[in-house]
Amino acid sequence: VIFSDPLCPFCITFVPEAVEYMKKEPNKFAIYYYHFPLESLHPAAVELTKAAVALELKGAKDVILNLYKVEVDPKERKNEVILAEFNRVMNSKITMADLMSSEVLKHFQNDLKVADSLMVNGTPTLFLDGVLDKTKMKYKEVK
């Protein structure tokens, strides 16, 4: 289980590497990814996350991996700027209406509720077999 903010500097390097590693071993890993944007540090991450959810709900693949390729100022607050960069990188046409849909908001809120229930307060946070992995590297030791 991974909780991550797409604009967190450590997440940008960690998450794509970890996900790619785990994808190569589908018999060993089931990846559960939860969006956990840290709004106070990276306000732009909230809209980026909602855009990613909207695109996933439309059936797009590899959204999570590509999300970490979106380069936007973490402090950006103009939704049109955030969405334009997201759509450019993803080659998509997500709109503000998509971000505000009840389905997207429900999914987004659910991710935050799961994080809250597990007392996640930072990113990236990794649980391996139900145990918090503070090193974030134990996945490489799975046999």
What residues fall within each predicted segment?
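Cysteine-centric redox/oxidoreductase cores and disulfide-bonded domains
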Residues: 38-123, 127-143
